[in-house]
Amino acid sequence: MCELCQTMDLTCLYVCVRIQIKGGAVIMCTAACFKDKDCYFGKNLDYEFSYGEQIVVTPRNFEYGFRYTDEPSYKYAIIGMAHVSDGYPLYYDAMNEKGLGMAGLNFVGNAYFNPVVKNKTNVCSFEFILWILFQCETVEEAIHLINEMNLCDTPFSASFPPASLHYMISDSNKTITVESVKQKSIKTYKKRQT
């Protein structure tokens, strides 16, 4: 029995929900990862309008052009939901060919991204999903990269400022939430083991 929902006969790993009401419109994201004999990862985007999102496949070794850091030497293929601007996939959520999934969820009023920091791996918030999924097979590998990086506040463009997000990262064995908040920098939360 799932300790979170008390109804499903599955081993739930994590559920992350964030709701914000603006002018009568409900803006919400829900992400979930659970497993029985298989592992399931998914997210919805409950907006009353579209940003032009589409299913996007980014092939192995795609040259993304990260703003402040070198390209990883090898990059996994990725599929997910993204808005494409100037040839760059701005992923909302995605999964790589190794089965590592990642979703960005609303965190308005709480998300804080830092200015660029010298002598640190600086990854822009809009690059974060690609940065992790290009080079990690597991949540543990993602945690290692996250501990070495600065999630910075550089906008993609004048039309696309940093989105106020926190993130869920999941593989078949583990799920974490990643939050970049003021005074704590990047914090990871693991699902409590039972």
Question: What would you call each of these model-derived segments?
Answer:
Residues 1, 134-137:
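Short, surface-exposed alpha-helical recognition segments that flank or form part
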Residues 5-6, 11-27:
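Short, Lys/Arg-enriched N-terminal segments with co-localized hydrophobic residues
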Residues 21, 96, 171:
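Acidic surface patches and DE-rich sequence motifs
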Residues 27-121, 148, 153:
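A contiguous strand-loop segment
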Residues 38, 125-126, 139:
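Alpha-helix initiation and N-capping motif
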Residues 114-130, 135:
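Helix-start/capping segments and mature chain N-termini
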Residues 136-194:
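Accessory structured domains or lobes within enzymes
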